[in-house]
Amino acid sequence: MKSNKKILFIGAPGSGKGTISKILVEKYKLVHISTGDLFRKKISEDSQFAAQIQNYLSSGSYVPDEITNKLVADFIKKIPKNQGYILDGYPRTLQQLEFMIKNGINLDCVFYLKIKNETIISRLSQRLFCQKCQKSYNLLLAKPKNELKCDLDSTDLITRNDDRPEIITHRIEKFNNSVIPIVEFFKKSGIIYYLDAEQTLEETVIEIEKWL
C-alpha cells in the first residue's frame, strides 16, 4: 500500500512521533524526514558541522533555523513530487514555518500528538538507541527483543545525553513555547487533527489511518 500524502507530526519529545512515523513509513511507503536523524547523519559525515551543532543537541536547545532549514530543504528536493512523506520535528519555530511556506513545502494533513509532561519524562527516561544504526527503542513501548542489544545488528544500546531529566524538562518548555503559533497557523488552514498520545501507539496509528 502506498500513500502520496505529505504529513506533519507535531508533538513534544516522547509523544511517539518517531515510532509512529516508522510504522506508517513501512506500511504506506512514505519517506521519513526527521530533523534529529538528519542532524546525526550530518554529524557522522562532517566533523566541522558536528563541532558547530553538538552543543545545541546535547543541551536540548534548537539548532539555528538557517542550518535546519537548509538540511530539510536539501533533503526534500531529492524526493520525487508524487512521493508521500512524513515531517517529524519540523517546523519547530515560526521562522521555520515561514521558510516552509516561502519555499512551497506543502502539507496535506497535520497531526498534533497531545501528551502530559509526566508521561513524557517517564517515556524518555526509558529510551535507548543503537550506536550503529540509530534505531530507537523504549523499554515501556517498544522493547528490543534482546535486552540492551539492537534487533537489527546486535550492537549495544545506549541512552542519549538529551534524555536526562533536567534536559527533558528544558526541551518540554522549549516545545510548549514555540508550538503555539505553528498550531494556530495550521488550525486556520483546516488541516490539523488532535490526537491523544496517552493512548497506546497502536490506537494512535488506527486514528491516523482514518485520514490517510
From Swiss-Prot:
Leading EC class: transferase
GO terms assigned for molecular function: adenylate kinase activity; ATP binding; zinc ion binding
Region (NMP): 34-63
UniProt keyword annotation of RNA-binding present: no
Recorded catalytic activity of this chain's protein: AMP + ATP = 2 ADP
Binding of ATP, residues: G14, S15, G16, K17, G18, T19, R127, S136, Y137, Q199
Binding, Zn(2+): C130, C133, C150, D153
Protein name, entry field: Adenylate kinase
